[in-house]
Amino acid sequence: MPLAKRIIPCLDVCNGRVVKGTKFVDIKDAGDPVEVAKRYDFECADEITFLDITASIEGRDTMIHMVEAIAEQVFIPLTVGGGIRKAVDVRAMLNAGADKVAINSAAIFNPNLINQLSEEFGSQCIVIAIDAKKVSDNKWEIFTHGGRKSTGIDAIEWAVKMTKGDNGAGEVLLTSMDCDGVKTGFDLLLTKAASDAVDVPIIASGGVGNLEHLSEGVLQGGADAVLAASIFHFGEYTIQQAKQAMQENGIEVRL
């Protein structure tokens, strides 16, 4: 029996509110993080991802009190990212109730960080988050600090490097900056290139505008999980509608 594919609503949090932008800018308010998370828990989302989108830019820690508040109210796996730079940050997030932590910018500055964290905490709770922008045909580059800083690093090569070996990251959260918030679907070439290249689950992110896009991420992109925000935040679709649509397309999901 194939493993069920996961639907993961994403809470981008800025100044204590859930927000959603387009291509990492043009931010709109989408509600209180705890209330939004409770709704997704009630709707039977498979997981929730909480990203403090300005923590790395502002050089501060993730909003731990909000992670604690969400973890008290939801009973599905919670991934937390933003401003996590070292082992003490990971421990604080796990103690606050997170099940997994997503590392993005910090891994660029310390490429050994993922291995160190996976060895200490287990690869199952370490996610490498990659924000990728297309720079030419079949080539994507990593950007950091909320998509503001170019690194010159090839996104697919980085995904391979960060997941190889026993102490690599256990998952890849792969966001297309070109597609983010545009609602035209995932960058399927990017998603497929990554899923073909690594041996750990790929979470496709960036671009979902309708339910069909979720299925495309799995069937064409090879994703193990699909992440979306605005189609759920603003009430266009429910999690159950999304799962039913994926099931109708022959995808195994947990209803």
UniProtKB/Swiss-Prot annotation:
UniProt xrefs under InterPro entries: Aldolase_TIM, His_biosynth, HisF, IGPS_HisA/HisF, RibuloseP-bd_barrel
CDD domains: HisF
UniProt GO molecular function: imidazoleglycerol-phosphate synthase activity; lyase activity
Enzyme class: lyase
GO biological process: L-histidine biosynthetic process
Gene Ontology cellular component list: cytoplasm
Annotated pathway: Amino-acid biosynthesis; L-histidine biosynthesis; L-histidine from 5-phospho-alpha-D-ribose 1-diphosphate: step 5/9
UniProt keywords, alphabetically: Amino-acid biosynthesis, Cytoplasm, Histidine biosynthesis, Lyase
Location of the protein in the cell: Cytoplasm
Catalyzed chemical reaction(s): 5-[(5-phospho-1-deoxy-D-ribulos-1-ylimino)methylamino]-1-(5-phospho-beta-D-ribosyl)imidazole-4-carboxamide + L-glutamine = D-erythro-1-(imidazol-4-yl)glycerol 3-phosphate + 5-amino-1-(5-phospho-beta-D-ribosyl)imidazole-4-carboxamide + L-glutamate + H(+)
Catalytic residues (UniProt): 12, 131
EC numbers: 4.3.2.10
Family: Belongs to the HisA/HisF family.
HAMAP family, A to Z: HisF
Function of the protein: IGPS catalyzes the conversion of PRFAR and glutamine to IGP, AICAR and glutamate. The HisF subunit catalyzes the cyclization activity that produces IGP and AICAR from PRFAR using the ammonia provided by the HisH subunit.
Subunit structure: Heterodimer of HisH and HisF.
Protein name: Imidazole glycerol phosphate synthase subunit HisF
Organism: Ruthia magnifica subsp. Calyptogena magnifica
Protein encoded by which gene: hisF
